[in-house]
Amino acid sequence: MTNTENYFKVGTIVNTHGIRGEVKIMAITDFAQDRFKKGADLFIDTKQGRIPVKVQSSRLHKNMWLVLFVGVTNINEIEKYKGDDVYIEGTARPELEDDQYYYDEIIDSTVVDLDGNKIGVVKEIMETGANDVWIVQRDGQSDALIPMIDDVVKSVDVDAKLITIDALEGLLD
């Protein structure tokens, strides 16, 4: 894998689709429809280095993005990238409003309660429609599901990767 500084992971090529060179990408971005739209510039991170690609077409199919890159005409040209991650350049990320965060800013953050007691580490983000839910891995306990709502999340320090929550009664049971 190459140096990914100033690049942000937006998905992983999990398989090919059909014989015309489409790939199935498992997206890990809030903005998948923008990341994989026609003309979007992406980078495939391979063992040999980062390969720039441009999206020719894309569509959502069974919770995966089916993407065809410009210049790819058959499965043999793309199969070698199965399992590789897909990135965008950091300059392609728009500024977010206050209290909005990119997944990579939240994942691997430590979660503490109002007294500073460690609850766990965010390992995944689940989109529910109304609000995101952060899945927090706890030592020796089942994962905690933390809703991203003002009543619960009190502060997020992106630089320190530290999230403070108000552990409302029953939230961590």
Curated annotation (Swiss-Prot):
Residues 98-171 form the PRC barrel domain. Gene3D superfamilies: PRC-barrel domain, RimM. GO terms for cellular component: cytoplasm; ribosome. GO terms for biological process: ribosomal small subunit biogenesis; rRNA processing. Keywords: Chaperone, Cytoplasm, Ribosome biogenesis, rRNA processing. It is found in: Cytoplasm. GO terms for molecular function: ribosome binding. The keyword Cytoplasm applies. Belongs to the RimM family. The PRC barrel domain binds ribosomal protein uS19. An accessory protein needed during the final step in the assembly of 30S ribosomal subunit, possibly for assembly of the head region. Essential for efficient processing of 16S rRNA. May be needed both before and after RbfA during the maturation of 16S rRNA. It has affinity for free ribosomal 30S subunits but not for 70S ribosomes. Binds ribosomal protein uS19. This is Ribosome maturation factor RimM. The gene is rimM.
